[in-house]
């Protein structure tokens, strides 16, 4: 049986390491016909050269999850690390074809192929396209007819891989395919309940990676996966990693209901809750299922900016959502994205007025300044029209949009002024807690028996520092 080595490139550990769920799902799709091994840079003693030498792969897949941290001020690009730490060593260690994939790759396929001197790549979902690519190479066929396959200077006739049937995908089973120890203490086990997004946010690259239609897994399948993982790992937290958890309406409710029906005792959290779809009944179901916290990503609380960003909810709906989660005592992290098209000081102050009036002071508010420009988005079209970028210019290396009505310096000045008086508001450039703060938080949680979300413990420390 031929061998495939799948290499993860996300080695960031702050604020906590992120497990390579995408690689594990591709591995599951490959395993019936291939001998597969995953290299996880977060594993103890991870040694790429030793793994390549011992495994002697026939093909190597390099997963590229992120391009950068999408932080305008003091942000970090991952391009050089991916190339120097993974792609170049792989080229030196093995003659096996190097194939790129992942969300970060799919946004900039030709740029990454050139940077990494790779042979092929898969744009979009890899569970079907990657095995098809390998089969074509084994048979000596040209793989460029496979949707989503790209090579330096060449692309298939269909840019992205055909969307897979998510209800037929095998479970990722991360803990069976890699050492889960690095993720157990701070991270949460990732669960994906659907793919695709039907929303039209101006800046977002999700639809071009996963498609513009929701493809939902049956609630029973989602909860089967949770139950199986809990049976293997015991007391482990789970995080739903969909772009938005409660879209489309009814899907999140069905999952929560299924968890409750089975009597599972689990700890849950989720990356995104859409204010357009929040009801008291949903939050009650989520609390009953085991949610200890949620995230909400409205991006703005200005009616003008909600329209400019093409959000699918109104200020009134956002206010109602904030009222519902506060009355339900559901800990919530809020995320706002300031500086988009048409942003002014007045619209920024509208967002902070919402924070003051509706957000629980015990909840953390994450403020991002400027918006990362990605190709093939409405924001890209605006950026070209306003001469932020030139048509066809590569955006692999970080470029950010800031409303011309403000400018970068004025935006940073306003946000700095407003966050300085609000201890629960954290700028994106300051959002990763330093190691000493994380250690202090861990000490407090242990000594005081705190069973609150970590962000609330960190806020306790921030308040103490600001008043000291």
Language model: regions and residue ranges:
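Non-cysteine beta-strand/loop elements that form the S-adenosyl-L-methionine
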Residues: 62-64, 126, 282-301, 364-372
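Radical SAM enzyme core and accessory elements
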Residues: 2-7, 35, 49-58, 95, ...
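Catalytic cores of alpha/beta
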Residues: 109-115, 342-356
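Acidic, low-complexity intrinsically disordered segments
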Residues: 2-227, 231-234
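Short helix-capping segments at alpha-helix termini
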Residues: 91-95, 140-142, 260-266, 328, ...
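Radical SAM [4Fe-4S] cluster-binding motif and immediate context
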Residues: 170-333, 338, 353
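Hydrophobic/aromatic residues located in beta-strands of well-ordered beta-sheets
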Residues: 4, 36, 98, 146-147, ...
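Flexible glycine/acidic-rich beta-alpha junction loops that bind and position SAM and/or redox cofactors
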Residues: 13-14, 66-70, 110, 199, ...
């Amino acid at each position: 049986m031929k061998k495939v080595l799948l290499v993860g490139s996300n080695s960031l550990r702050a604020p906590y390491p992120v497990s390579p769920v995408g690689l594990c799902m591709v591995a599951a799709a490959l395993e019936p016909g291939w001998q597969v091994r995953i290299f996880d840079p977060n594993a103890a003693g991870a040694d790429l050269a030793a793994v390549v030498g011992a495994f002697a792969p026939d093909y190597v897949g390099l997963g590229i999850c992120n391009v950068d941290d999408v932080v305008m001020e003091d942000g970090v690009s991952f391009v050089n690390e991916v190339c120097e730490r993974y792609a170049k060593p792989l080229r030196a260690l093995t003659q096996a074809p190097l194939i790129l994939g992942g969300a970060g790759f799919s946004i900039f396929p030709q740029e990454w192929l050139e940077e990494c001197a790779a042979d092929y790549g898969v744009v979009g979902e890899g569970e079907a396209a990657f095995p098809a690519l390998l089969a074509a190479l084994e048979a000596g066929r040209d793989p460029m007819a496979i949707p989503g396959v790209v090579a330096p200077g060449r692309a298939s006739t269909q840019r992205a891989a055909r969307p897979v049937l998510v209800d037929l995908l095998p479970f990722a089973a991360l803990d069976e395919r890699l050492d889960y120890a690095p993720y157990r203490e701070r991270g949460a086990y990732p669960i994906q309940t659907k793919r695709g997004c039907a929303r039209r946010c101006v800046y977002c690259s999700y639809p071009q990676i996963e498609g513009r239609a929701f493809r939902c897994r049956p609630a029973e399948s989602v909860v089967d996966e949770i139950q199986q993982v809990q049976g293997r790992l015991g007391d482990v937290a789970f995080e739903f990693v969909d772009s938005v958890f409660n879209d489309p309406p009814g899907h999140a409710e069905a999952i929560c209901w299924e968890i409750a029906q089975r009597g599972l005792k689990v700890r849950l959290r989720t990356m995104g809750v859409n204010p357009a779809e929040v009801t008291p009944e949903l939050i009650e179901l989520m609390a009953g299922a085991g949610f200890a916290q949620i995230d909400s990503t409205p991006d703005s609380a200005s009616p003008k900016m909600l329209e400019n960003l093409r959000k699918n909810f109104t200020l009134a709906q956002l206010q109602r959502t904030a009222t519902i989660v506060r009355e339900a005592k559901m800990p919530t992290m809020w995320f706002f994205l300031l500086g988009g098209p048409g942003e002014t000081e007045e619209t920024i102050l509208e967002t902070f007025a919402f924070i003051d009036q509706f957000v629980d002071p015990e909840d953390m508010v994450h403020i991002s300044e400027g918006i990362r420009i990605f190709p093939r988005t409405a924001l890209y079209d605006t950026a070209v029209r306003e001469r932020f970028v030139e048509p066809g210019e590569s955006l692999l290396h970080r470029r950010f949009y800031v409303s011309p009505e403000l400018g970068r310096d004025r935006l940073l000045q306003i946000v700095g002024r407003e966050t300085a008086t609000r201890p629960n508001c954290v700028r994106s450039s300051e959002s990763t807690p330093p190691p000493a703060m994380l250690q202090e938080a861990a000490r407090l949680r242990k000594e005081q028996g705190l069973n609150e979300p970590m962000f609330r413990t960190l806020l306790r420390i921030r308040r103490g520092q600001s008043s000291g």
